[in-house]
């Protein structure tokens, strides 16, 4: 991935703060990335949101998170929020959504949560 070689890292997470999220709120997710290799690791870390679409399928959107250089044994703590409030460029649908990390282009397993619809709010 553009000069970033695969790295020997252990990734704990992502973990979401709430498994049920009211529409218009934000989800908080955390993770820890640890360099388990013997050499320094150059990392580019993104997060991937799997959005529910109107037809029930999921579409992905990648967001930049950080670039870092970790010494052997060093950790990078991730603590981020992603908003689900109304915006003009995306429409949100209730149901299961997911967040995953992507380190040097390699995705982690995702953490899921349910976006709830409110009766008086357009979704």
Positions of predicted regions on the chain:
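A beta-strand/beta-hairpin structural motif
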Residues: 60-87, 115
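Short glycine/proline/serine/threonine-rich loop/turn segments at secondary-structure transition edges
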Residues: 86-96
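Short acidic/polar inter-strand loop motif in beta-rich domains
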Residues: 86-88, 102-111
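Short beta-strand and strand-turn-strand segments in soluble, beta-rich domains
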Residues: 9-13, 53-67
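Surface beta-strand/loop "capping" patches
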Residues: 1-36
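Short beta-strand elements
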Residues: 106-123
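Beta-strand-rich binding/interaction modules
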Residues: 26-34, 38-53
């Amino acid at each position: 991935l553009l000069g970033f070689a695969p790295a020997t890292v252990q990734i704990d997470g992502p973990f979401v703060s709430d498994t049920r999220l009211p529409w218009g709120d934000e989800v908080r997710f955390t993770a820890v990335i640890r360099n388990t290799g013997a050499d320094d690791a150059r990392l580019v870390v993104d997060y991937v949101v799997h959005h529910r679409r109107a037809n029930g399928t999921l579409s992905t959107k990648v967001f930049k998170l950080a670039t870092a250089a970790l010494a052997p044994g060093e950790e990078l703590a991730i603590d981020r929020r992603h908003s689900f409030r109304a915006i003009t460029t995306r429409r949100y649908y209730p149901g299961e959504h997911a967040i995953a990390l992507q380190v040097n282009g390699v995705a982690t397993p995702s953490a899921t949560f349910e976006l709830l619809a409110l009766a008086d709010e357009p979704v």
